[in-house]
């Protein structure tokens, strides 16, 4: 489908880039600008990013932005329940690609907690995340081909609780269809309260997924649907 065929809700922005490199640089510049505004207004800022392979170039570009990183807190939208030393750790990814150079001065608050069970780890993380200076100032989300975002997976056990717009938890246990299955995620109530919300996607398959998500009425079928409303801006390249 053509990007022009996308029928976005009122208040949802769209930025189209020509390549992955352009998207990474442009997204980093927008995030940096929003963080500067937050710092100017309130003296500190909270940035929440997503993991996976797609954000690497963006994280590296953002690490080079001239910011007062010492006044910025960085956290994750979700995490695989693995130690930071594990290859699948989102925290490890952020430390390698974002928290370097001047950006290493940022305060990082991760989700992973060692525990006897995923549920216990989520409870520990929930307590730990009370250090986050909510609400989130800038949130950068991704999206899977199944319409998940963060670790809010369609039909996953615990999804109803995680999608509760009035929920009070800051971290919940979730199960993913792909390995590693055990995940920790910020719930909808925390994510949707972010002041600036950005969704970074790439390619025709993600465009088709986005179009399908816009058409569903039951957000549990494609959880990203819950975020496809103002103040979201979508960053896409073909």
Swiss-Prot record:
GO terms for biological process: carbohydrate metabolic process; pentose-phosphate shunt. Coiled coil: none annotated. The keyword Hydrolase applies. Keywords: Hydrolase. SUPFAM superfamilies: NagB/RpiA/CoA transferase-like. Pathway: Carbohydrate degradation; pentose phosphate pathway; D-ribulose 5-phosphate from D-glucose 6-phosphate (oxidative stage): step 2/3. It catalyses: 6-phospho-D-glucono-1,5-lactone + H2O = 6-phospho-D-gluconate + H(+). The keyword Hydrolase applies. It is an enzyme of class 3 (hydrolase). InterPro entries: 6-phosphogluconolactonase_DevB, Glc/Gal-6P_isomerase, NagB/RpiA_transferase-like, PGLS. Its EC number is 3.1.1.31. GO terms for molecular function: 6-phosphogluconolactonase activity. Hydrolysis of 6-phosphogluconolactone to 6-phosphogluconate. Belongs to the glucosamine/galactosamine-6-phosphate isomerase family. 6-phosphogluconolactonase subfamily. This is 6-phosphogluconolactonase.
